[in-house]
A protein has these predicted regions:
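Short, charged beta-turn/beta-strand-edge "cap" motif at the junction between a beta-strand
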Residues: 205-208
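Residue-level marker of positions within ordered structural domains that often coincide
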Residues: 50, 147, 201, 214, ...
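A short hydrophobic beta-strand segment most commonly corresponding to one strand
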Residues: 141-144, 216-232
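Catalytic core of non-heme Fe(II) oxygenases with the double-stranded beta-helix
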Residues: 118-200, 210, 217-218
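Non-heme Fe(II)/2-oxoglutarate
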Residues: 2-113, 119-131, 168
Length: 237
């Protein structure tokens, strides 16, 4: 839909207003998207994790990341399987739907939407470890939860959280600005039922991960960044 079509659609909405009847009018914004991975995709990423752990010259990603956690290992998306089968179509449709909102891309007016996965890694975290507030490089980023050793209800009943008016133990949290310019947080509570779920979001959207407690298990998650394909820029020259 062109900008002109947007204006016409907006005028039509005004013309349809009924006298004396109030209705909500949501300000434009963009969503984040979520899904549950099919079993073949889950099996694929577990296999890639095993391969990364077995590598004698495994590539630690810790020096490139803000996480205060046990380990982050680079993963290999063999034959671009995960990107092509799980991410590509959805991500490119997202960028096409929200072209000027997804990134700081200076060429967004040229409708470039071809993407590739620039980075792909697995995170292993133990109790008391955390990821501070940060964003990512790229256009879109994603997180997949593979193993969650705690339940948020139990974590929020721990002494450090029980009497708080904002219990956060084990939470994942996004930060964004509301219509007043105030910073708001959107919490994603961690529970084993979320194992296998994926969230995709603009890379510049800030987020953090709080520590969990009273469990000796690992929290295992996968992250990755999607960028515009450099070949698309080359074709423009």
């Amino acid at each position: 839909m062109s900008h002109y079509d947007d204006i016409l659609h907006g005028m039509e909405e005004w013309s349809n207003l009924k006298a004396g009847k109030w209705e909500t009018w949501d300000l434009p914004n963009i969503p984040i998207i979520r899904s549950r991975l099919p079993k073949p995709a889950i099996d694929f990423v577990w296999k890639k994790i095993e391969e990364a752990q077995e590598e004698e010259d495994y590539q630690s990603m810790k020096k490139n990341l803000v996480g205060n956690i046990t380990e982050s290992l680079e993963l290999q998306d063999t034959d671009d399987y995960f990107f092509r089968h799980i991410l590509k179509d959805t991500a490119e449709h997202y960028v096409e739907s929200f072209p000027t909102n997804c990134s700081k891309n200076p060429f967004s007016d040229n409708k470039i939407k071809e993407l590739y996965m620039k980075s792909f890694w697995v995170n292993f975290s133990q109790k008391h470890e955390f990821n501070p507030v940060h964003d990512h490089n790229g256009v879109l980023s994603f997180v997949i939860w593979l193993k969650i050793p705690t339940k948020w209800q139990e974590q929020h009943q721990l002494p450090i959280s029980l009497d708080s008016n904002l219990p956060c133990a084990s939470n994942f949290q996004f930060f964004y600005s509301d219509i007043f310019g105030s910073t708001r947080g959107m919490v994603v509570e961690m529970d084993p039922m979320m194992e296998g779920c994926i969230l995709m979001f603009p890379s510049i959207l800030q987020h953090q991960v709080y520590p969990f407690y009273d469990s000796d298990g690992y929290r295992i998650s996968i992250s990755g960044n999607l960028c515009f394909d450099p070949k698309a820029f080359k074709d423009m020259l």
